[in-house]
C-alpha cells in the first residue's frame, strides 16, 4: 500500500515526518511535571515511559481497569460505520486492540493502519496482528499523531483509544485527523474523562493517585513513574464538553459523546 508521496506501508516501518516543536516547561522530568508539558519534551518523556511497560501493557490494562477496557473498546469500534473496501486509521494504536476490532468493519477488501509513535508498543501490536493472520489487512506503522503524513482525505474512518491525552499538541493532532478524513468521514475517540458523579470522582481520584501507581509498579516493576504520569495526564485532559468544543474548533461537525462507566471514560464521535 502506498500513498502519493511514495511511502510504502507494509509490516512495521518507521515514518519520520516530525517538525521541530518546543519544550513547554523547564521543570525537571517528574511524572506529574511531564503531564503538563507540551511539544517534543513531553513526547520524548512519554515515549520512554511506554517503552518501559510495552511488554506488560495489556496485562496491566486488564488488571487496572478490572477488564473494562475490553468492553470500552468494543463499544468504541461499534461507532465505526461498516464500509465496503474501507480505509481506517487507528491513531496511537499501541498494542492494536482497537485496530483489530475496526478491521472487520472495513469489508473484505478493506485496510486498517495501526499507527503509534512508540516502536516497542507497535511490536506488541504486530504480534497480535500476525498471530491472527491479518498481516495483509492491518499495517503497523510508526507515526506522530500531530503530523501523520497522509494525503488529505485518505481515510473513511479514524479511531483512537487512550492516546489523545499523551500528545504534545492536542489541537494540532485533531486538525491533522480532520485533514486526513474524507468528507463525511468519522472520527471516534475513546479517552479517559471526568466522572459525572461526585462520589465517583472522589473514589476514582483515590484509586488513580493512590492505588494505581502502587499496583502498576508492583506488576510492571517500573521505575519511570508512568503510573504516576497516567492519572496526572487524565486530570489535565479536557473534560467531555471541552473536548467536544475542541473537535468543533478543529472543523468537525455533528460532535456527540457518550459516557461509559459513569464518565470514567467517554467516546466522542465527530463527522467531517
Residue ranges and their predicted role:
Residues 250-272:
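Core SAM-dependent methyltransferase catalytic element
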Residues 13-48:
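N-terminal auxiliary segments of SAM/dcSAM-dependent transferases
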Residues 171-183:
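A short glycine-rich, Lys/Arg-flanked "PGG" loop and its adjoining helix->strand segment in the class I
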Amino acid at each position: 500500500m502506498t500513498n502519493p508521496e511514495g511511502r510504502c506501508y507494509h509490516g512495521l516501518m518507521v515514518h519520520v515526518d516530525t517538525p521541530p516543536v518546543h519544550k513547554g516547561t523547564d521543570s525537571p522530568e517528574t511524572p506529574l511535571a511531564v503531564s503538563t508539558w507540551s511539544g517534543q519534551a513531553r513526547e520524548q518523556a512519554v515515549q520512554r515511559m511506554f517503552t518501559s511497560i510495552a511488554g506488560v501493557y495489556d496485562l496491566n490494562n486488564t488488571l487496572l481497569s478490572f477488564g473494562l477496557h475490553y468492553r470500552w473498546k468494543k463499544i468504541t469500534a461499534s461507532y465505526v460505520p461498516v464500509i465496503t473496501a474501507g480505509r481506517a486509521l487507528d491513531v496511537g494504536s499501541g498494542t492494536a486492540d482497537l485496530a483489530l476490532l475496526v478491521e472487520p468493519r472495513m469489508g473484505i477488501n478493506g485496510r486498517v493502519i495501526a499507527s503509534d509513535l512508540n516502536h516497542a508498543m507497535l511490536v506488541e501490536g504486530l504480534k497480535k496482528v500476525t498471530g491472527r493472520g491479518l498481516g495483509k489487512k492491518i499495517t503497523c506503522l510508526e507515526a506522530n499523531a500531530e503530523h501523520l503524513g497522509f494525503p488529505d482525505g485518505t481515510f473513511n474512518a479514524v479511531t483512537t483509544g487512550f492516546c489523545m491525552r499523551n500528545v504534545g499538541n492536542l489541537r494540532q493532532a485533531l486538525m491533522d485527523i480532520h485533514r486526513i478524513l474524507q468528507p463525511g468521514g468519522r472520527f471516534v475517540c475513546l479517552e479517559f474523562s471526568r466522572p459525572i458523579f461526585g462520589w465517583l470522582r472522589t473514589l476514582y481520584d483515590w484509586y488513580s493517585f493512590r492505588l494505581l501507581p502502587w499496583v502498576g509498579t508492583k506488576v510492571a516493576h517500573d521505575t519511570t513513574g508512568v503510573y504516576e504520569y497516567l492519572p496526572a495526564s487524565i486530570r489535565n485532559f479536557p473534560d467531555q464538553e471541552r473536548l467536544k468544543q475542541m473537535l468543533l474548533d478543529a472543523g468537525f461537525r455533528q460532535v456527540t459523546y457518550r459516557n461509559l462507566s459513569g464518565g470514567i471514560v467517554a467516546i466522542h464521535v465527530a463527522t467531517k
